[in-house]
Every structure is written in structure tokens, then in C-alpha cells.
Amino acid sequence: MPKAKANNIEIEYDTFGDPSSEPLLLVMGLGSQMIRWVEELCMMFVDKGFYVIRFDNRDVGLSTKFEEAGVPDIMKEFMARQRGKTISPPYTVEDMADDAVGLLDALNIEKAHICGASMGGMIVQIIAFRHPTRVLSLTSIMSTTGNPNLPQAKPEAMQLLLKPAPAEREAYIEESVKRYRILYGSGFPYPEDKFRELAAVLYDRSFYPQGMARQLFAILGTENRVPKLVTIKVPTLVIHGGDDPLVPVEGGKETAASIPGAELLIIEGMGHSLPFETWPQIVDSIAKNADKVNN
């Protein structure tokens, strides 16, 4: 897969479909490599007429790592933030939004439909108000607004963020299978074998938990985005699982309520995951939202 110079770093990316089609930039979440946007799902977007771009965020996968920044003590920083103290992550979620726009620059793409999941939802929200001329439509999936007064993650889901990943391959795979199960939601059968295969591929491609810690530090440093979300003017779709234990559905509801004209799609039984049974509905909904640009 190719690399691009973007925002003074190197971004690993991948594309699907016809470059002359309307671009759709897919942005993944915390500690997640771009291959979590699996090829089958990317090709479903291609079949809807999109030119699909997926990429590794900074500090994950095969993009630039920020090793010189060290590994933060997340619990200490979390407690400091809870006490109202200012924290200073080595980079911000705004920097990550600028990375994504820098990738569009490198690919000579003036405007794109943007879709992000979880932390990726935060990133695309920021792109939409920070770089409004670059956005055709916005989809925010299983994300939130940064409002500290919203319901927080369930304790068992929050623990997943704070518990270190095992360094040994087989232990990592088994732990990942357990973690995915907790996040998956109760409404769909859990495909354990698929997630075991995915965990192995992710480990072999890039095992780098230090980057996830720094990304989480960046998330801890975010502010309430509601005052800026109200300025977004592009067609917006917010998708959320009704059974999300990590980012409760109230985060999706407030995102949709904050962006003028936004449509909200709540998928009952879906957790903090994208079960393959939901893909047709999700792809159709994103394509319909994108169609609003031309209508």
C-alpha cells in the first residue's frame, strides 16, 4: 500500500474504485488500523459509486509513530482532567483532522464525503467545521460531541481502554476476541472466528499499543464540540448502536441534535462495532446522505 506526505508526517493509505468517482474518506477509531474498514465493506461503497480512501491515522498501523513523545500515564492524565486541570498531549485530535485533510491534498482531492467511526467520528466532525470547504457530506458513526456531561462508558468497556494489551501474539489474539465481544452488542450473533482472524492480521501488520495510549491522551484533551458542530452546513448522517457500551447512544443523539438538519439512525442491538448484518443499511444510508449534495 502507498504512503503520502501529509501534515509533515507519512500516512499509509489504500484506495478502491475509480478515482474519477466521488471520493469517500473513511476514518478509523482509537488504536485501529485502516484494515478495520474491511475490503468487503469498502467494495460495497464502490458499488454505490464512491472512490474509497482508507488510511492509518498517525501513531497506528504503518503511518508515522511519535515514539519521541513517550508513553503517557493515562490514568494519571484522566484523573487530572477530571479535576479540571489542563493536560498537554503531544498532539491533538485537531492535528489528526489536519492529517486527513493533508492526505486529500496529497491525492489532489478538493472535496470529499467523509465518514468516521468512534474517534474517527470526532475527527470527521472536526474536519467539517475546521475545513468546511473540503467536505461534501459528513457521516459520524458511534461517536460523540465531547460534552463531559453526557453518560460515560460502562465500567467494563472503560476498563478495556485502560488495560494494557498483551505483547505475546496468541495472548493478544485471545484478549482481542474477548474485548470485541464486550463491545459488540447483544442484537447480532458474535462472529468469534472472524474476529480471531482479524486480530491475527492486525497483530502481524502492526502491534503498537504505545500509539493507542497517545491517541487516547489526545482524546482526553478534547473540548466540547457542540458550539462548533452547530456551524456545520453539509448533509450529515449520525449512526449509533442502541447497545453501545463504550460510547453510549446519547453521544450520537446529541451529535445529531447539534448539527443543523442532521439525520439520526439508531441501530438497535448494535454495540461499538459494525456487524456485517448492518452493512447494507449503513452503506445505503451513507449513499443517500451523499446524494443530498447533488439534490
Where are these regions (language model features)?
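Flexible "cap/lid" loop of the alpha/beta hydrolase fold
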Residues: 129, 138-167
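Conserved acidic catalytic loop of the alpha/beta-hydrolase fold
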Residues: 82, 87-90, 94-112
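Alpha/beta-hydrolase
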Residues: 153-227, 254
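Conserved HGGG/HGGXW glycine-rich cap/lid loop of the alpha/beta-hydrolase fold
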Residues: 9-83
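Acidic catalytic loop of the alpha/beta-hydrolase fold
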Residues: 243-247
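Short beta-strand/loop motif that positions the catalytic acidic residue
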Residues: 232, 238-240
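Short glycine-enriched nucleophile-adjacent loop
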Residues: 121-132, 138
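Catalytic active-site module of serine/aspartate enzymes centered on a nucleophile-bearing elbow/loop
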Residues: 262-295
